[in-house]
Amino acid sequence: MKPTGRGYLLLDAHPVGCFRSVELMRAEVPVPEKPPARRPTALVIGSSSGYGLASTIAGLVRYGIDGVGIGLERPAGHRSATAGWYRTVATDAIARELGADFSFRNADAFADTTKTETLDLLAERFGGVDYLIYSVAAPRRTDPRSGTTYQSVLKPLGAPHTTRNLEFADDGAAQVREVTVAPATEAEAAATVGVMGGEDWSRWITALAERGLLRSGFRTVALTYIGSPLTSAIYRGGTIGAAKAHLESTARALTERLAAVDGRAFTSVNGALVTQALTAIPGIPLYVSLLRGVLGDRFPSPVAQSLDLWHQLTARRPDVDDSGRIRLDRWELSEPVQAAVAERWRSITPETVTALADTAWFRAQCRALYGFDVPGVDYTVPVATDLPWPES
């Protein structure tokens, strides 16, 4: 199997490469000296990719969680299954090896039927939930109650924004291209909040509360991002930022509601990483490549940041900022790092991009999302692609 596609989007995923990616993530997690006195129950919404996947692996290996993970993935057909399908198969193998009672559901997290069926499973098998991690990146959401489908857009607010984007030619050569993005309409901004804001997260908490499944001390977290001033017009100051602001206000409202069970809701401001969603945001691929160029191997992996997240979630007094947010991005937003990235951003040209930005690393990371360019995999060996979803 060879990678085929256009730009950052590949059409197939390599099963063995995806398995190996999960193995490498697991290897980053330190094994505790002794198992927990009680296995906590966690619900991870968005467990098949990104920080949701990393948090699931870290939780299984380091914190001994049981529970349920939810992802929405496509099985093999004319093409391979999606990468998240294979990553879930690999993560399930880890859970079974560790003796964890952890089920994976292939379902639309936005749907009421998914909530009902998942809560039925949680009630029957565990009787309650200690943690809920909400890590959903979706282009659209259908509200099951109104029937309205919201479509998110990646646009600035108020005025057009011109930035530079990192792209790759068919031969892998890095290119820098200037792009201008038109501002979002009010309707587009509202729709993006409808997809990526806190409404669905809040509905999950409400559903758990109505079923009496919130254990004492329950904690929940949704992942957010602030990012650099270099990307603020398209990210924090754009439609996505409006959705993240709604997510953060939802956390404050949820904390008030969770007082009855001595619970808390947080947003976690994580640092940059390479995801399929990120590659679609103009300017972000170049910024992350420059950030890696500055930091080198000091760039924290998703697993490293997820271990920090679990440490904060399980701490008696989590380290939060003045807005009540867990901050895992201080390494990225430190003044020396941002100054160095900004200097490279100002200096970059098509001729200097490979010297100033770690473009080879970024391209490899993007391909690894689909199971390609993963160390330790022989890509000349034929592979089976039609693998079953893990049994509950």
Swiss-Prot record:
Plays an important role in discriminating NADH against NADPH (site feature) positions: 73
Q: Spell out the catalytic residues.
A: 235
Q: In which pathway does it act?
A: Lipid metabolism; fatty acid biosynthesis
GO molecular function annotations of the record = enoyl-[acyl-carrier-protein] reductase (NADH) activity; NAD binding; trans-2-enoyl-CoA reductase (NADH) activity
So what does this one do? Answer: Involved in the final reduction of the elongation cycle of fatty acid synthesis (FAS II). Catalyzes the reduction of a carbon-carbon double bond in an enoyl moiety that is covalently linked to an acyl carrier protein (ACP).
Family to which this protein belongs: Belongs to the TER reductase family.
Q: What is this protein called?
A: Enoyl-[acyl-carrier-protein] reductase [NADH]
Identify the coding gene.
fabV
